[in-house]
């Protein structure tokens, strides 16, 4: 199978925007990882995306992935020309998000009798079928993938999509890379950062923006520090300059108990140093950082929102609390930090849940089957793995 994978942005050519935000989006991470997983399974994959900068190449190979950047203002026309010439062997389409040029791929697929699958990885991407002509085209795909039950409900209620077309399937993570550390490994990692082996460590890893609940984090950590001066906070991620400044100020005001680490290439060591993950985000799909933390053995305190409620079950894999309620976050974080046995039990349950329903070894074959199906084949794979 030669799969055309369409995504709005991919390898845009700059690591950070002018205001400090990393330019690589969750959709881009998923596109890259899914392409690699599909290639491992013997499929050819071409990623079609926007060309945003003059200096980026129109076509190149990146890690074995054929990447084509489409030129403005005629991306749809260029896409159709390529599908009839340089990429005429494409016989299946996989769309992540709702890039405008993808409507031409959908129409082309229908004309040729090829399957087309659309995956939404965020609540904000849900479309209203009758809103405009593009939305009407997006509502005609062969199959749909929702990474959460909230997105599935949005497909049905707003997009008018038949339930039998919708598969609820995690985007997946590499559980062979995100692993629980040994006692010795955790001790060594902490020593490298000057953190006591006996300290209780809270971890936050996400973009430093308001939507991720950084303002709530700024409120909850002083509460935790006041109750447990020996606890430590690791803040991993780059983002808005003003919020980064406020985090550094908070670290000083809490006696240096918080480490503001900025953007890192590889977050695993920071998960492995931790005891509890905290995630006060305002809205999510299926949070990758939460999956990574859980796979690394951390129970979590999270906002009670879509996506998080597909992963965190109170008293079993962590706790859900009301969004923006800093006091509730602090209370549950302190409860977990002070309960070694409960923390260990919930961490083990978190690892088991992620391995059961979110590992690439579980997800990728199901993804490939949906993409190549010419008939509706919806199934709730997430629900099937939820026994905690």
PLM features per residue range, with description:
Residues 179-195, 366:
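A short helix/loop element that forms part of the nucleotide-sugar donor recognition site in Leloir-type
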Residues 196-212, 218-221:
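Conserved donor-binding/catalytic core segment of Leloir-type glycosyltransferases
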Residues 51-52, 173, 205, 232-245:
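Glycosyltransferase donor-sugar binding loop
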Residues 191, 328, 335, 342-356, ...:
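A short, well-ordered alpha-helix in the C-terminal region of glycosyltransferases
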Residues 150, 172:
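Carbohydrate-associated surface elements
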Residues 314-315, 319-326, 335-340:
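Conserved acidic donor-binding segment of nucleotide-sugar-dependent glycosyltransferases
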């Amino acid at each position: 199978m030669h799969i055309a994978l369409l995504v709005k942005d991919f390898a845009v050519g700059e690591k950070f925007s002018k205001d400090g935000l990393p330019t690589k989006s969750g959709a881009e991470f998923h596109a890259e990882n899914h392409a690699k997983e599909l290639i491992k399974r013997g499929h050819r994959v071409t990623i079609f995306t926007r060309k945003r900068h003059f200096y980026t190449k129109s076509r190149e190979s990146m890690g074995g992935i054929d990447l084509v950047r489409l030129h403005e203002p005629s991306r749809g026309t260029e896409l159709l020309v390529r599908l009839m010439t340089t990429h005429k062997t494409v016989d299946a389409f996989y769309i992540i998000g709702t890039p405008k040029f993808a409507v031409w791929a959908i129409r082309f697929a229908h004309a040729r009798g090829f399957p087309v699958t659309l995956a939404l990885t965020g609540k904000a991407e849900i479309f209203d079928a009758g809103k405009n002509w593009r939305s009407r085209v997006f509502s005609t795909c062969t199959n749909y993938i929702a990474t959460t039950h909230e997105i599935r409900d949005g497909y049905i209620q707003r997009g008018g999509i038949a339930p039998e077309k919708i598969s609820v399937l995690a985007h997946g993570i590499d559980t062979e890379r995100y692993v629980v550390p040994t006692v010795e490994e955790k001790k060594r990692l902490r020593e490298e950062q000057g953190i006591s082996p006996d300290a209780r460590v809270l971890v936050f890893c996400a973009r430093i923006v308001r939507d991720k609940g950084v303002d709530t984090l700024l409120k909850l950590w002083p509460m935790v520090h006041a109750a447990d001066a020996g606890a430590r906070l690791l803040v991993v991620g780059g983002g808005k300059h003003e919020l980064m400044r406020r985090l550094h100020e908070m670290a000083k005001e809490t006696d240096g108990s918080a480490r503001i680490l900025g953007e890192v290439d590889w977050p695993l060591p920071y998960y492995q140093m931790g005891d509890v993950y905290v995630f006060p985000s305002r809205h999510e799909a299926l949070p990758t950082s939460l999956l990574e933390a859980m796979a690394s053995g951390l129970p979590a305190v999270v906002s009670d929102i879509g996506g998080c409620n597909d992963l965190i079950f109170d008293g079993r894999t962590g706790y859900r609390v009301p969004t923006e309620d800093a006091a509730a976050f602090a209370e549950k974080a302190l409860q977990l930090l002070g309960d070694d046995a409960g923390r260990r039990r919930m961490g083990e349950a978190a690892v088991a849940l992620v391995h059961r329903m979110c590992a690439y070894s579980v997800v990728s074959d199901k993804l490939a089957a949906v993409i190549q199906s010419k008939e509706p084949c919806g199934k709730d794979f997430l629900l099937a793995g939820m026994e905690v």
